[in-house]
Amino acid sequence: IGETVLTGTINTTGSQTYQSDVTIEGDVELNAGGDISFSDEVFGNQNGSAGDPDLTINTQADTTFGGTVSNLATLTTDAGGSTIAKADITTTGNQTYNDELVLNTSLTLTGGNASFTGGIDGDGNDLTLNFTGNATLDGGSTTISGINNLTSLGGVAANGTITTTGAQSFEGNATLIGNTTLVGPSATLAGTLEGQEHDLTINYTSPTTISSSGSNINNFTSVGDVLLNTTAFETIGSQTFQGNVTLTGDTMLTGTSGSFANGLDGDGHSLTLNYFNTTTIDGNSVFNNLNAVSY
């Protein structure tokens, strides 16, 4: 079977099945009453000065990408059904999944911005998000589950509960668009944390490394152990550390109040507590290896 070239709008009352490589010539819209299936590669062909083409898919059934998707400007799927991805998807612009995105393998999504309105089912696979803008992970209005390792190389806009069975790595900046809870075995928060006055709870079984100073986070809660790899960590509201806290350098903590339930290891560094209200240090906890403590 030879290559298939798609142009314009294609409407079917039943399914659409493309068993060979597909080239998208110009902006294409596919409307189907049944499944839409691509067995091999989907490739966008530049249309002169118009640039890479857009691909819009509308079906209440399943859309399956069996091969890589590349050279598209934007990719948009409608609500209802699911999008099943079996390989990497790359766009120069935005990716909008209004239906559930199901990972059939570990893969990377690359583009401008990403929206997962229909949720994500990782099915035990790894997901890497490589977007120059923000990838919006809204666990408040939809379900994000089944992802093993989650890595974001660019920005993330987060809300609700985001749970992984493997590690979470946020290499870019993270923005809270609602009260957010992150759950998994371990995490690295390497970029800035912009809270937009929302609460952040991190619940990891292994120590979490925080390298950001934090900005406009309301209440912060860490259920597990934390490594503070920053000179300052600031919240608008309270800071609650339920696990062990370890300093990797001199650190100032600023907020309305602080609570340390399980001790702090200064590792030879200085700690400044800049809380406006009461700082609670549990009597069973131990503050040790501190160079100096300032209140």
Where do the protein language model's features map onto the residues?
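Extracellular lectin-like interaction modules
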Residues: I1-Y295
